């Protein structure tokens, strides 16, 4: 019985030796310690609870809650505090701060900066970290690339089509979420959105066009040429004005020539126009100019003699007999003529009212004219000796 029990004991003693061999040759390199020392060769970087401060761009309270929820799911985190005003995130726990930083940058798509670096590691942990650095030393030995220069603060006016108040609030909310934007001022009447902050216009315009799904145009202020553009315009307009000057003179001359006849009529009109023509020297000049323009214009001469005859006719002591409607047979028209008086100062035609009658004329009645008046030049109906 004793020999049978010794067999299993020998096997149990050989088992630890079998387990030690693979541990020593795991990485293909001999290690100084046993299995327990090899397992404890890579402990976590932060063995104690510590607090780390990260700088993350947080726009609002909702953004801060989202980041806090994301960090709490990370292993070893005990507490998370977010400061929206200062864009700071305080994380407390047994964590690797560098891994958490990379995780946050991957999830939020934003730049995350570790404000307080982790404390220096001493002992076996430092040796393990040194070996890791030695493995990837070529990558970390390269000098860091110089950081791009931060854009200066600027004010950018943009032309965006605005429909209503809800549309304005939506656009304002979208623009404020863009990194680097500080304030947004919107003028709904002019469809102008003014953005202030440390932003690049070349990157902002295509980004807003994609997010808003409408045309976005930057408004560039007009350059001051110190009047150079105006001088060029005046110089270009000067030869055109010279070309137009002679043609305008010809048109005016034609117009004046065509108006000659009208001006002659003004000269040869009735007594009132004659009086006006005799009032001042200026109007006489106009009358004289009308005569000269008659030669140029070639208008038809006005019947001056007929006008004078009518003047004589109006004031003559021997007027012609007027024409009257003939007395009707059907409707009864009565033009009872009591008689005609020919006073020296004028004439009168007494008669009764009007009635409808047939259409015919009474022949002229020859007035009683004295012998000297028949041959007078002032009488338009007088006789003349040939």
From Swiss-Prot:
Ranges where the HMA domain occurs: 49-112, 153-220
Induction trigger: Up-regulated by cadmium.
Entries under Pfam families matching the protein: HMA
UniProt keyword annotations, A-Z: Lipoprotein, Metal-binding, Methylation, Prenylation, Repeat
Lipid modification (S-farnesyl cysteine), residues: 383
Propeptide residues per the UniProt entry: 384-386
Binding annotation for a metal cation 1: 60, 63
SUPFAM superfamilies in the record: HMA, heavy metal-associated domain
Keyword Transmembrane among UniProt keywords: no
Residues that bear Cysteine methyl ester: 383
InterPro entries, sorted: HIPP01/3/5/6, HMA_dom, HMA_dom_sf
Record-listed a metal cation 2 binding positions: 164, 167
MF terms in GO: copper ion binding
Disruption phenotype: Strongly increased bacterial disease susceptibility.
Post-translational changes noted in the entry: Efficiently farnesylated in vitro.
Start and end residues of each stretch annotated as Disordered: 1-40, 129-153, 223-301
Biased composition (Basic and acidic residues): 1-16, 130-141, 223-245, 252-297
Family statement: Belongs to the HIPP family.
Function: Heavy-metal-binding protein. Involved in disease resistance.
Protein name per UniProt: Heavy metal-associated isoprenylated plant protein 5
Organism annotation: Arabidopsis thaliana
Gene: HIPP05
């Amino acid at each position: 019985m004793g020999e049978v029990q010794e067999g299993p004991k020998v096997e149990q003693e050989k088992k630890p030796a079998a387990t030690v061999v693979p541990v020593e040759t795991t990485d293909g390199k001999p290690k100084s310690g046993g299995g327990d020392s090899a397992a404890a060769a890579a402990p976590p970087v932060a063995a104690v609870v510590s607090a780390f401060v990260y700088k993350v761009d947080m726009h609002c309270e909702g953004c801060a809650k989202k980041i806090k929820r994301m960090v709490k799911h990370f292993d070893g985190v005990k507490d998370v505090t977010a400061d929206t005003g200062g864009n700071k995130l305080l994380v407390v726990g047994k964590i690797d701060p560098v891994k958490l930083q990379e995780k946050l940058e991957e999830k939020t798509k934003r730049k995350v900066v570790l404000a307080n670096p982790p404390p220096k590691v001493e002992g076996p942990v430092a040796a393990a970290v040194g070996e890791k650095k030695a493995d990837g030393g070529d990558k970390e030995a390269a000098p860091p690339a110089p950081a791009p220069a931060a854009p200066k603060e600027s004010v950018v006016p943009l032309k965006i089509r605005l429909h209503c108040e809800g549309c304005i609030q939506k656009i304002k909310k979208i623009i404020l979420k863009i990194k680097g934007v500080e304030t947004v001022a919107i003028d709904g009447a002019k469809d102008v959105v003014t953005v202030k902050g440390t932003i690049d216009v070349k990157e902002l315009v295509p980004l807003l066009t994609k997010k808003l799904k409408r045309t976005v145009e930057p408004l560039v202020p007009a350059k001051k040429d110190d009047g150079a553009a105006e001088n060029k315009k005046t110089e270009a307009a000067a030869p055109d004005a010279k070309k137009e000057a002679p043609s305008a003179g010809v048109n005016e001359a034609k117009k004046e020539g065509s108006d000659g006849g009208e001006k002659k009529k003004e000269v040869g009109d009735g007594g009132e126009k004659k009086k006006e023509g005799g009032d001042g020297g200026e109007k006489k000049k106009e009358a004289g100019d009308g005569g000269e323009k008659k030669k140029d214009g070639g208008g038809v001469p006005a019947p001056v003699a007929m006008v004078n005859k009518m003047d004589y006719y109006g004031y003559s002591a021997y007027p012609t007999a007027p024409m009257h409607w003939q007395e009707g047979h059907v409707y009864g028209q009565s033009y009872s003529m009591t008689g005609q008086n020919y006073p020296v100062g004028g004439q009168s035609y007494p008669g009764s009212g009007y009635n409808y009658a047939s259409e015919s004329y009474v022949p002229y009645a020859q007035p009683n004219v004295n012998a000297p008046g028949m041959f007078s030049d002032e009488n338009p109906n007088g006789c003349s000796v040939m």
